[in-house]
A protein has these predicted regions:
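Charge-dense, intrinsically disordered terminal/linker segments
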Residues: 1-67
């Protein structure tokens, strides 16, 4: 899923993940947070991104951390 998020940011084009449209702003926030956390938390984030509910929680968390 991280590859898809990076693709959304790179191409500036929304895409569907788990049946949800993900816009560039949300994808960018998620990628930024992912890149800033340590390896252990990156693994946890990758695990969360495998389910729709986890993906939504991750998106909400990432958006709350972007100022």
């Amino acid at each position: 899923e991280m590859a898809t998020l990076r693709s959304i940011v790179d191409n500036r084009q929304a895409e569907k993940i788990h049946g949800m449209m993900v816009d560039m702003f949300t994808a960018s926030a998620m990628v930024q947070v992912y890149d800033k956390v340590n390896d252990e938390n990156q693994a946890k984030m990758r695990e969360m991104l495998t389910t729709p509910k986890g993906f939504q929680r991750m998106a909400d968390f990432a958006l709350s951390k972007i100022s």
